[in-house]
Design a protein with these regions (language model features):
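N-terminal secretory signal peptides
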Residues: 1-13, 21-27
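Acidic, metal/ion-coordinating pockets
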Residues: 2, 19, 35-315, 357-368, ...
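Catalytic centers of hydrolytic enzymes
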Residues: 40-64, 69-77, 83, 196, ...
């Protein structure tokens, strides 16, 4: 289960004020670039998106603001900016493909084709770009017309710039000469990968210390006479650094960076400064598009000004016709798929609290699907994504996407009943968790801690070995919330296996098999 960090509330927008502000910003950016060339300065602009997650058409914010975002609107904005600014670059900061049926059906190639169509100069790997496994990822590399920038990833003894096969496309950094100035772009990925993704999906790739990799890349880029260094980092704004977003410490420890473009944390942060580095983050799903303006003195070649802002992609931006023409067949096919009915719900099914009906239903369906694939289990440990109750009526594929928004693989392992108790006890400390250990009853001891398991009215011996299924995200630690679980499953005796079955597919298959739930 991937945790999505909620962005700050988008304030109410006064239409007239926004239009005036946007027009002024656009005019300033455009006239500023041209006026700079008339004097003894020149502006190089960098346009950036991040965490598109396969969104092509408008969507909603987490707070419910509708009809915003989508790559098709970002494309319109970027084309407009390019007309205003003759010297520009366009980059994406990761998590490009995972998140929508239309992207999933194409294996992500549609999104990469759209980046190619718009002439992106580079994109950076995000953690969710690994979700579909190494074969799909390598297809994306082969498809990409631009380099994939990630300095802090290794494969065995090989480093970026020294990979073979499709991975040749992955470089630590690239240099682009724009308007006579050399702009180095260095990519970084979050070091949180091993706490979310199993080795089978990473395909031998490992994230290394981003500060060490960045320092080496900056040294190389400056040695190649870079006039400015821009970092595209799939690590984002947080109130404080954490294991997945150590942005403050990285920029504190590494000199020579002028701009940091952030991703991963799904925040709209138009402009902030850390250790004299200008930072910007353009939210998620194309809801904002970001722009950096770097102004250089033409005589000294020094960087004399840096500015950053983001723009809300609402209905003031048309859907780009070229993007829509390329995406339309896939969008129409996805619409048909999403409308497919998979089951009928006969009565409300609760989705709140530990042991809720929806979590229990998921566990039952996962078990049944694994059994049909010759992988029977004794237990399933899983929860919901806080999507609420299921109401009576038809249940469609679209509903299944809301219930399970990620393609997390099912993992099986052989553990003792005592191990399962330890797993449940660890999860009990997570106040927002509704994970359920099906089909067991967890009996609390003195103090309320889980003390024993019961099944069909009898205690389960602590040393009994049982095969349990859970999703790969939880098996890897659930974002470091389940480190004891990770340790238990990593033991050789657990015989841990990652199945080729993802949880949403298991849900859909199980519902189709049942036909009626409730």
């Amino acid at each position: 289960m991937g945790k999505i960090v909620q962005p700050r509330q988008v304030p109410a927008i006064d239409r007239r004020g926004f239009l005036a502000g946007f027009t002024a910003s656009a005019a300033l950016a455009g006239s500023g670039a041209m006026a700079a060339d008339l004097g003894r300065a020149r502006t190089v602009s960098i346009f950036h998106t991040t965490d598109l997650h396969g969104r092509i058409v408008p969507t909603s914010t987490y707070e419910g603001l509708d009809d915003v975002g989508g790559f098709a609107r970002c494309a319109t904005c970027i084309r407009q900016w390019r007309r205003e600014s003759p010297h520009s670059l366009t980059v994406d900061v990761g998590d490009v493909v995972q998140g929508t049926p239309v992207s999933l059906e194409s294996g992500g190639t549609l999104m990469i084709d759209l980046l190619n169509r718009l002439g992106y100069d580079a994109w950076t790997l995000g953690n969710h770009d690994f979700d579909w496994g190494p074969e799909k990822l390598e297809t994306l590399f082969d498809r990409s017309a631009s380099p994939v920038l990630t300095a802090n990833v290794v494969r065995g003894a090989a480093m970026p710039g020294g990979f073979d096969g499709a991975w040749k496309r992955v470089l630590p950094w690239t240099m682009r000469e724009i308007g006579g100035f050399r702009i180095a772009i260095i990519g970084l990925i979050t070091p949180g990968l091993p706490y979310w993704l199993p080795p089978e999906l990473l395909g031998g790739a490992e994230a290394t210390d981003p500060a060490v990799a960045l320092a080496a890349a900056v040294k190389e880029a400056r040695g190649e006479k870079a006039d400015a260094v821009v970092v595209t980092g799939h690590m984002g704004w947080r109130f404080n650094d954490d294991y997945a977003n150590p942005v403050r410490s990285i920029l504190r420890d590494v000199d020579g960076v002028d701009v940091y473009l952030a991703g991963h944390s799904h925040q709209n942060q138009p402009s902030w400064t850390l250790h004299d580095v200008l930072c910007s983050q353009a939210s998620y799903h194309g809801i904002h598009c970001g722009r950096i303006d770097l102004t250089f003195d033409l005589d000294s070649r020094k960087l004399v000004d840096r500015r950053a802002f983001t723009i809300l992609m609402d209905d003031r931006f048309d859907l780009d016709p070229a993007v829509m023409a390329a995406a339309q067949p896939g969008l129409e096919a996805a619409e048909v798929t999403l409308a497919r009915e998979v089951a009928k719900v006969t009565r409300p099914i609760s989705g709140k609290g530990r042991g809720n009906g929806l979590a229990t239903l998921l566990c039952e369906l996962f078990s049944a699907t694994l059994r049909r694939h010759g992988k029977p289990v004794d237990a399933v440990f899983h929860g919901t994504f806080a999507t609420g109750d299921l109401q009576p009526g038809p249940l469609t594929v679209a509903d299944c996407w809301k219930i399970i928004p990620y393609e997390n693989m099912l993992v099986t392992a052989e553990v003792t009943a005592a191990d399962l108790l330890a797993i449940v006890a660890e999860d009990a400390k997570q106040k927002d968790s509704d994970r359920t250990l099906w089909p067991f009853e967890v009996v609390a001891g003195d103090g309320g801690a889980p003390a024993r398991l019961r099944h069909q009215g009898a205690d389960v011996p602590a040393d009994r070995r049982l095969t349990v299924a859970l999703n790969a995200y939880d098996a890897q630690s659930g974002g470091r919330r389940l480190m004891k679980t990770r340790e238990i499953l990593a033991a050789p005796a657990a015989n841990r296996r990652t199945s080729p079955i993802d949880t949403r597919s298991a849900l859909i298959d199980g519902l189709l098999d049942r036909g009626v739930v409730g």
